Curated annotation (Swiss-Prot):
GO cellular component: endoplasmic reticulum; endoplasmic reticulum membrane
Binding site for Cu cation: C80, H84
Residue numbers of 4-aspartylphosphate PTMs: D677
InterPro entries given in the database record: CheY-like_superfamily, ETR, GAF, GAF-like_dom_sf, HATPase_C_sf, His_kinase_dom, HisK_dim/P_dom, HisK_dim/P_sf
One of the GO biological process terms: negative regulation of ethylene-activated signaling pathway
GAF domain ranges (all copies): 173-321
Tissue note: Leaves, flowers and fruits.
Name of protein: Ethylene receptor 1
Location(s) in or outside the cell: Endoplasmic reticulum membrane
Top-level EC class: transferase
Cofactor binding comment, as recorded: Binds 1 copper ion per dimer.
Recorded GO MF terms: ATP binding; ethylene binding; ethylene receptor activity; metal ion binding; phosphorelay sensor kinase activity
Domain called Histidine kinase: residue spans: 364-601
Gene name of the encoded protein: ETR1
Amino acid sequence: MGSLLRMNRLLSSIVESCNCIIDPQLPADDLLMKYQYISDFFIALAYFSIPVELIYFVKKSAVFPYRWVLVQFGAFIVLCGATHLINLWTFNMHTRNVAIVMTTPKALTALVSCITALMLVHIIPDLLSVKTRELFLKKKAAQLDREMGIIRTQEETGRHVRMLTHEIRSTLDRHTILKTTLVELGRTLALEECALWMPTRTGLELQLSYTLRHQNPVGLTVPIQLPVINQVFGTNHVVKISPNSPVARLRPAGKYMPGEVVAVRVPLLHLSNFQINDWPELSTKRYALMVLMLPSDSARQWHVHELELVEVVADQVAVALSHAAILEESMRARDLLMEQNVALDLARREAEMAVRARNDFLAVMNHEMRTPMHAIIALSSLLQETDLTPEQRLMVETILKSSNLLATLINDVLDLSRLEDGSLQLDIGTFNLHALFREVHSLIKPIASVKKLFVTLSLSSDLPEYVIGDEKRLMQILLNVVGNAVKFSKEGNVSISAFVAKSDSLRDPRAPEFFAVPSENHFYLRVQIKDTGIGITPQDIPNLFSKFTQSQALATTNSGGTGLGLAICKRFVNLMEGHIWIESEGLGKGSTAIFIIKLGIPGRANESKLPFVTKLPANHTQMSFQGLKVLVMDENGVSRMVTKGLLTHLGCDVTTVGSRDECLRVVTHEHKVVIMDVSMQGIDCYEVAVVIHERFGKRHGRPLIVALTGNTDRVTKENCMRVGMDGVILKPVSVYKMRSVLSELLEHGVVLES
């Protein structure tokens, strides 16, 4: 009340000071008038303070978009306050000036109020939209919160997947993989039980193979045709199943409701190509079944991210199992391969031992058979040159011919043996091809004339005279093939033709593997031997190049089989990068043997260096060996006697010794030739040759050294040449052969017989 009295006195003083005219018609209730004065004063005060506050906060805000609207509101409020302040004087009489002052703010207030009202029509929707945007942003923020929750859940799921994948793939043992999967799933998802059912080998049942808590006996089986199993196997997603289904009844019954159960299939690798002992044969069903159970004492349910985690883990388990299966198969294959390698290594060693044993046997047989054959042939040849009755001469010739045939057979066996084990190599050199054909013709012609067969030789004009190849093996092929033609022909003729094979004649449909490639450095020689003999049936032709075969036609003629000849010829032709075959129109129509071999062409730069001249038959019978001093060293008494008999028959003065020391003690400058058997047991005959070289020095002052051996291998020949021997003679030796060797040795100072 005191404040009102003070306000009343203040207003009274204001009225008195302004000389206001009080309307005498106003109500006389002074108390009401005082309250109106007080109200207008405070309204004006509020109106003046509100704009100040607006201006203050707008200046503090940098983002408010409606500053000019606030200016209008401020003006409107200030003017409203001014009108209320002016109303303090309206209760008394006032002058015209006061009326003008009162009217002006009211007019301005009216104007600003109308403008502000009009502007609010446009501003209010924006203000409402701000509220709408606020609600939208709140909704968006809530959605972002949910998405962030999903992302966090996915990250958590991904972390668990990575962790589980790492644990699963940390091993390639399938038992460890499956046990680790159950343990990690149980720990990550807080499961009460987790089990894996595997198909049996028959594929008709699922067998309980692994469990998490180990409370259930492993080995339980359920039929694979159960509806719940078909439902799970029919999709690659997790399927919720009843806790009472046969595959889920794995936990003991309790007072709580069982938790939710889900199942998912686990694809298994198709094992048709793998034979793993305890893995099922998967023909129709290729899945295992994984069952996962939530705890029974909670109201927990499966979430989407948990189901996705289970699906991903099932796929990872499938991949890990496939890797484990492949690893197991690889290990099994490795073990099997190791066993096979051990067996192969054992077989290889046995084969090598067999080859060595065979070679040793052949070497011994070669030496041991050539030594008695040397005596037979040498003595037979000596008898042949004595005065004999016709009957005796026929018997001696038969013995000599049979012995030579046996020697040829031994050579063929040794050649075939070396061909089969790959130890035989061609002796490549330059030789006169024309002279070789003429020599073969001169050797075959006397044999054919006995059977009244005509042998003709035809060499084409473009055939090179000098070629590069194995002269000895080519002659062996020709003698074998031409010899067979003469052997199986009773009458008619045998023709030999040789020419350079053209490109169109190199291909043979019977041998598609033979592919000839001519070049400037070599050519292909084609040789055809045609006879008018008994002929061959088509079905017998493929067997002719087999060892010791005999066709039906040959059996009826009592001519014998082809022996090893053609088989060896085929091997020689193959070594010469060629091809051999036989053509015949049938029995009684003759046959044609054809072979193609590859020969080199000597370079023009080397043509002037060729030391070869056409070989003419040497007239060894004209050379005299009377008084020629020869020393023979051989431990075999029979062989010593035979060799001495041959040399004595030729007129030589022969001294024989049986040991190394005796040979070195006896040999002198008077001895022109030393013949030694290099196959003597326990004696290094090569050392004897070295000592003779050292003792007598120069070649013209020492005797010529010749090796007499039954060994036909290349090593023996190379060893003889290495120690400086002047020649090699192969047993057996006839009188004619010994005369030829001595003549060549004395004439040229060297003799080599391969």
